[in-house]
C-alpha cells in the first residue's frame, strides 16, 4: 500500500495557523509603532523626500511598502489601511513559511520542516502586526537563505535566477537594517574569492546591484549637500545617541542579566552529556545530558511564558548548544544548517547595532538561528541521532506553542484581549477592534481632523505632538515634523529642522491621556518649554478640542483660498 505524503498535511497546518493569525489581526489598535512604520511611505506619497524631510534612522525600508500604499490610496484612500497592512503581512508571512517549509523538506522530515516554518510564522517582534522593518528583515533574510539553498541544489538557468533573487532579498534586508550591509559585504566578498562559489556570488551581486540602483535612482534625493546634512541629523537622533557599539554591549549585558541561570544550566547539560558519552553506551550516552537540557528549557519557558514575543527562542538557542557541540565533535555538520545559524547570528548582530531595545534586538535573528539548530539536530543519523531528534522536536514544539500563544494573547499598546469590544468604522483603523476608551478617543480625533480639513487647505503642514503617527494617515495635511515618532514641544531638533523646512501651520498638542495603554501610560506626555512652544504661545491662535489643543499659524491657508 502506498504511503501517504504527509507534506500536504503539514502545509495545511501552516495555513490554519495563518488563518488564526488573520482573524487575530482584527483585534488591537496600536497608537504608536505600527502606524509610525506606515507614515514613512505616507511621507513619500505626499512628495516628501527620504533623509531631507525625514530624520528617523529606520526610514529606508519605506520604499518597499510605498508602491503598495500608492495603489491602496488610489483605490480606497487611507480608510482601513491598518487592517490591510496587517492582513497583507500575514499573507506574505504565510507564503514565505510555505516556501521555507517545502525547501526544508528536501533536508529533513516534514515534521521538522513544519516546526521550523511554524517558528518563523509565529514570530513578530513586539507582537506588532503590520509590516514593521523587524518582521520584513526576518522575512527577506530567510527568503535569501531559501533561494540560495535551492540555487545550490539546482542547475542551469534556474540556478542563476535563484541567486539573483537571493541578491534582491539581501538588498531589501539591508534597506530594513542598513548595518546588515557590513555582513553582506563580508560574506559576498568571501564567496567571490572562492572559485566554487564565485559564479553564484556574481549572480547574487547582480541582484544586490539592481536593488541598489532602483533605490539610488528612484528614491535617494539628488541634493548631495542636503543628503549629507540630513544624514548628520539622523545620526544625532536623541533616541539613538549612544552609538552602535554601545547598543550591542547593552544588548549583551541584558541577555547576561536575563539568561545567566539558563546559560549555566546549558553548560551543566553539556558537561553531563560529555560524561555520558565517555562512560555510557553510545546508544543512550547522550540521554542524561539532554534530560538536564530539557528540564532547564522547561523551567525557563515557564518562567518567560508571558514575556516578549520571541523570547522563547533564547531557550531553544541555549539548550540546543550541547547537542550542536556533540554534532561538531562527531563530525556530523550539515552545511545548510550551519549557514543558517551563521545568518541568524549576523542578523541578530546587525539588529543589535541598530536598535536600543537591548535583549529584544537579538530576537530578530534568533528564529533563523533556531531553525538552523533544529535542522542540524534533526538530521543526525548516528547512534545518538534518535535522542537528538526527539529532543530537538520536543523543544521546537514547546517553543512554537509558547510563541504562538504569546502572539495570540498578548496585545501591544492597547487593552487586554477581552476588552477589545468596539469596532472602529472609519479612518485608517477602520475594521479594527479596540477598547471603549480608545474608540472614543479615536472618534474625537477624527472629528477634530475633519473640522480642520473643512477649514484649512491641504497645503498646510501639520505637526502632532508628542506622538500620533496615524494622524498623518487620517489627515490630508503633509507631515511638518522631523519625524512622526515621539517629538515633544521642547525637542531641540525642531529649531534645526525649521531652519530648512516650512514651519507647520497647524500644531496639534494631544492630551496626555490620548492613546494610553497598560504597557504605556504616558504615551503623550509632553514638555511645554523651548523656543517652539514660545512661538506657539506668542503668534499662533488657539483652538481647544476635547482631545487636544490646536495652534493655528497666522500664515495658515484657508480652504479654497
Please give the residue ranges for each predicted region.
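Short periplasmic/luminal acceptor-recognition loop of GT-C membrane glycosyltransferases, typified by
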Residues: 56, 178, 406-487, 503-515, ...
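Short hydrophobic/aromatic helix or loop-helix immediately within or flanking a transmembrane segment
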Residues: 38-42, 53-77, 87, 173
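Membrane-interface alpha helices of multi-pass inner-membrane proteins
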Residues: 125, 147, 160-178, 184-189, ...
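Perimembrane helix-loop-helix junctions
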Residues: 153, 182-216, 277-280, 379-383
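Short acidic/glycine- and proline-prone juxtamembrane loop motifs at membrane-interface regions
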Residues: 128-137
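Transmembrane-helix signature of polytopic, membrane-embedded enzymes
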Residues: 95-122
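Short hydrophobic alpha-helices at membrane interfaces in multi-pass membrane enzymes
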Residues: 147-172, 198-206, 291, 335-345
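Specific aromatic-rich, kink-prone transmembrane helix
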Residues: 136-155, 162-170, 317-323, 369-372
Amino acid at each position: 500500500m502506498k504511503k501517504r505524503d504527509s507534506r500536504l498535511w503539514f502545509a495545511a497546518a501552516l495555513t490554519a495557523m495563518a488563518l488564526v493569525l488573520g482573524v487575530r489581526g482584527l483585534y488591537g489598535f496600536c497608537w504608536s509603532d505600527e502606524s509610525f512604520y506606515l507614515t514613512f511611505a505616507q511621507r513619500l506619497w505626499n512628495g516628501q523626500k527620504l533623509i531631507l524631510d525625514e530624520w528617523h534612522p529606520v526610514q529606508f525600508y519605506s520604499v518597499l511598502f510605498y508602491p503598495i500604499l500608492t495603489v491602496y490610496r488610489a483605490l480606497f484612500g487611507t480608510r482601513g489601511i491598518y487592517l490591510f497592512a496587517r492582513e497583507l503581512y500575514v499573507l506574505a508571512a504565510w507564503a514565505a513559511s510555505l516556501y521555507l517549509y517545502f525547501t526544508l523538506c528536501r533536508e529533513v522530515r516534514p515534521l521538522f520542516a513544519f516546526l521550523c516554518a511554524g517558528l518563523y510564522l509565529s514570530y513578530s517582534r513586539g507582537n506588532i502586526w503590520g509590516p514593521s522593518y523587524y518582521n520584513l528583515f526576518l522575512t527577506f533574510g530567510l527568503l535569501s537563505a531559501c533561494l540560495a539553498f535551492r540555487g545550490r541544489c539546482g542547475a542551469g538557468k534556474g540556478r542563476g535566477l535563484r541567486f539573483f533573487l537571493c541578491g534582491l532579498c539581501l538588498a531589501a534586508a539591508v534597506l530594513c537594517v542598513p548595518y546588515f550591509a557590513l555582513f553582506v559585504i563580508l560574506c559576498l566578498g568571501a564567496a567571490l574569492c572562492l572559485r566554487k562559489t564565485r559564479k553564484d556570488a556574481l549572480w547574487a551581486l547582480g541582484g544586490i546591484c539592481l536593488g541598489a540602483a532602483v533605490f539610488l535612482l528612484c528614491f535617494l534625493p539628488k541634493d548631495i549637500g542636503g543628503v549629507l546634512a540630513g544624514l548628520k541629523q539622523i545620526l544625532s537622533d536623541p533616541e539613538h545617541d549612544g552609538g552602535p557599539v554601545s547598543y550591542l554591549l547593552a544588548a549583551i549585558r541584558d541577555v547576561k542579566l536575563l539568561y545567566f541561570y539558563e546559560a549555566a544550566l546549558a553548560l551543566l547539560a553539556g558537561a553531563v552529556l560529555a560524561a555520558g558519552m565517555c562512560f555510557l553506551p553510545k546508544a543512550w550516552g547522550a540521554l542524561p545530558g539532554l534530560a538536564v537540557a530539557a528540564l532547564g528549557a522547561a523551567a525557563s519557558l515557564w518562567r518567560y511564558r508571558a514575556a516578549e514575543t520571541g523570547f522563547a527562542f533564547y531557550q531553544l538557542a541555549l539548550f540546543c548548544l550541547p547537542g550542536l557541540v556533540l554534532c561538531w565533535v562527531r563530525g556530523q555538520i550539515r552545511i545548510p544548517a550551519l549557514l543558517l545559524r551563521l545568518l541568524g547570528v549576523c542578523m541578530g548582530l546587525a539588529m543589535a547595532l541598530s536598535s536600543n531595545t537591548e535583549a529584544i534586538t537579538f530576537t530578530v535573528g534568533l528564529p533563523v538561528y533556531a531553525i538552523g539548530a533544529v535542522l542540524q539536530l534533526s538530521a543526525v543519523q548516528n547512534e545518538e541521532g534518535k535522542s537528538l531528534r526527539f529532543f530537538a522536536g520536543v523543544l521546537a514544539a514547546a517553543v512554537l506553542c509558547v510563541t504562538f500563544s504569546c502572539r495570540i494573547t498578548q496585545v501591544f499598546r492597547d487593552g487586554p484581549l477581552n476588552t477589545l469590544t468596539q469596532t472602529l468604522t472609519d479612518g485608517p483603523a477602520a475594521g479594527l477592534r479596540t477598547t471603549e476608551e480608545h474608540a472614543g478617543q479615536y472618534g474625537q480625533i477624527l472629528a477634530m481632523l475633519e473640522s480642520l480639513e473643512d477649514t484649512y487647505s491641504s497645503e498646510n503642514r501639520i505637526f502632532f505632538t508628542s506622538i500620533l503617527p496615524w494622524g498623518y494617515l487620517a489627515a490630508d495635511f503633509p507631515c511638518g515634523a522631523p519625524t512622526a515618532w515621539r517629538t515633544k514641544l521642547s525637542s531641540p531638533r525642531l529649531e534645526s529642522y525649521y531652519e530648512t523646512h516650512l514651519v507647520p501651520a497647524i500644531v496639534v498638542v494631544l492630551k496626555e491621556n490620548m492613546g494610553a495603554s497598560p504597557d504605556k501610560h504616558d504615551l503623550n506626555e509632553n514638555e511645554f518649554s523651548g523656543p517652539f512652544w514660545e512661538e506657539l504661545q506668542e503668534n499662533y491662535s488657539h483652538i481647544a478640542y476635547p482631545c487636544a489643543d490646536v495652534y493655528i499659524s497666522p500664515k495658515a491657508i484657508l480652504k479654497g483660498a
